[in-house]
């Protein structure tokens, strides 16, 4: 057994033993006194196993509305809390120093530094890969360094249309970013093979843009931050001078976690990057989760599902880590609420890449991660506000660019086919060119496979300027 696998096996065994001890010693119900009690604690209602839209909205209406636009700031971001920071060294190329350049007058998408990616040639033979660090903004409007990799096929033409691939990461470790993957021979556990499906676009002469949508702090599933990275990477492509792409158009697509990023970018783009509207041919959102209030329930944070082990708890743990990294100054007492088991899970997850991050948190009972009283606390209410702010379902706008939503009706992780259907109806009423592709009996893992031909055809058409035909009367059945 290799050293990394041996190390991960020990971690998983440790978590299992810790969980057993926690259950036996009753840490999950340890009192936390009346410390941090919210003035108006959230009423979570009594959500069903397949939480309805109305039950999610009941919780959402107790929280602040999601702002349509953010006020962009110039100063540095609030410091990240040390206990959620990875203890692995990050690539210096990712240094979060954008605020210094903003004070010099740099705008969104303006390049801070760049480098050639040598190892990308192993994945995409014959192509040139350039990695850029550029100015973007986080989910609260603070300047942030974003990174992306632009792969140029040898036969690319001037102003060729570009495929933006938004990779599913599901991780918290600094070695998980696509830019890092493509710049080293061993990315410590991340699955590299999915990014190679982009080779088809390269063969046809279309550049491919890989985004690092978790930002420099590896903040998993903070979707407004991810949206800014995606949109500012398009701006960056128009500004770079390594190859003439100033008038290039984009097709932006993602699956699962990549779908979360893409879906939020689609809905926020008219207000964050309105000048890009003529340049975006298509957003493709496959198996995204637009409603994080429901997702927290589906993954076992609260309600009846919190009483059974969740095989997907690792996703929720990664989100908790990402939320604390992004909003640490707003949830300063989160560490206080964690049990010893919870602290062990967080400490482990902050370094891991998929699939290890999923395995390490899987099968756990999330109620054992926090002390009794947590769900009445200001900290929990703030975390649910963060979840709402990361939900494209609760964003008050609609896309301007054509948007394709794809979801399986029996998705066993997200349970959000109804949410996508509701978004489709909402976007149609707003005048968006929208299609909802429904996959009967499709699961989270089979839906992308079954819908792959549809995605490929629409991608190729859109890259050649042929936009999708809107369908607002009935869902398309695949």
Regions found by a protein language model. Give the residues of each.
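C-terminal catalytic histidine-bearing segment of alpha/beta-hydrolase fold enzymes
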Residues: 384-387, 406, 421-478
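Alpha/beta-hydrolase active-site loop
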Residues: 193, 220-242
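Primarily recognizes the serine-hydrolase "nucleophile elbow" in alpha/beta-hydrolase
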Residues: 235-306
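Short beta-strand element of the alpha/beta-hydrolase
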Residues: 147-150, 159-171, 180
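Catalytic-loop region of hydrolases
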Residues: 32-157
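Conserved alpha/beta-hydrolase "acid-adjacent" motif
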Residues: 412-419
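Short beta-strand/loop motif that positions the catalytic acidic residue
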Residues: 399, 404-411
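Accessory cap/linker subdomain of secreted extracellular hydrolases
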Residues: 41-97, 286-396
């Amino acid at each position: 057994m290799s050293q990394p696998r041996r190390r991960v096996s020990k971690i998983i065994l440790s978590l299992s033993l810790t969980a057993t001890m926690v259950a036996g010693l009753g840490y999950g119900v340890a009192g936390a006194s009346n410390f941090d009690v919210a003035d108006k604690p959230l009423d979570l209602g009594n959500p069903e196993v397949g939480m309805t839209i109305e039950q999610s909205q009941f919780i959402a209406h107790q929280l602040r509305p999601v702002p349509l636009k953010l006020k962009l700031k110039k100063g540095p971001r609030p410091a990240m809390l040390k206990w959620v920071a990875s203890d692995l060294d990050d690539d210096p190329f990712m240094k979060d120093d954008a605020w210094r350049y903003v004070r010099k007058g740099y705008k969104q998408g303006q390049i801070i530094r760049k480098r050639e990616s040598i190892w990308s040639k192993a994945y995409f033979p014959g192509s040139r890969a350039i990695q850029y660090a550029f100015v973007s903004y986080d989910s609260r409007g603070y300047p942030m360094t974003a990174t992306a990799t632009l792969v140029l096929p040898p036969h690319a033409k001037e102003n060729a249309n570009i495929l933006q691939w938004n990779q599913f990461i599901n991780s918290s470790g600094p070695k998980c970013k696509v830019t890092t993957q493509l710049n080293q021979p061993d990315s410590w556990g991340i699955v590299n093979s999915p990014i190679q499906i982009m080779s088809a676009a390269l063969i046809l002469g279309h550049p491919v843009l890989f985004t690092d949508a978790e930002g420099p702090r590896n903040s998993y599933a903070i979707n407004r931050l991810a949206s800014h990275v995606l949109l500012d990477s398009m701006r960056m492509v128009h500004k770079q001078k390594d190859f003439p792409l100033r008038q290039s158009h984009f097709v932006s697509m993602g699956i699962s976690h990549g779908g979360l990023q893409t879906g939020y970018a689609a809905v926020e783009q008219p207000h964050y990057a309105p000048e890009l509207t003529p340049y975006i041919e298509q957003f493709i959102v496959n198996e995204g989760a637009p409603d994080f209030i429901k997702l927290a329930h589906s993954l076992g944070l609260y309600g009846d599902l919190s009483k059974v082990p969740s095989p997907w708890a690792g996703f929720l743990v990664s989100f908790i880590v990402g939320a604390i990294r992004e909003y640490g100054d707003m949830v300063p007492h989160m560490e206080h609420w964690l049990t010893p088991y919870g602290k062990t899970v967080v400490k482990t997850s902050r370094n891991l890449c998929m699939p290890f991050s999923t395995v390490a948190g899987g099968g756990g009972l999330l109620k054992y991660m926090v002390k009794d009283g947590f769900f009445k606390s200001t900290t929990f209410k703030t975390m649910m506000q963060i979840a709402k702010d990361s939900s494209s379902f609760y964003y008050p706008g609609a896309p301007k660019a054509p948007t394709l939503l794809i979801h399986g009706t029996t998705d066993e992780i997200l349970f959000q086919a109804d949410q996508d259907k509701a978004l489709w109806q909402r976007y149609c009423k707003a005048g968006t060119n929208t299609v909802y592709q429904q996959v009967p009996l499709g699961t989270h893992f089979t839906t992308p496979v079954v819908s792959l031909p549809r995605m490929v055809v629409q991608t190729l058409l859109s890259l050649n300027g042929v936009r999708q035909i809107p369908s607002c009367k009935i869902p398309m059945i695949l």
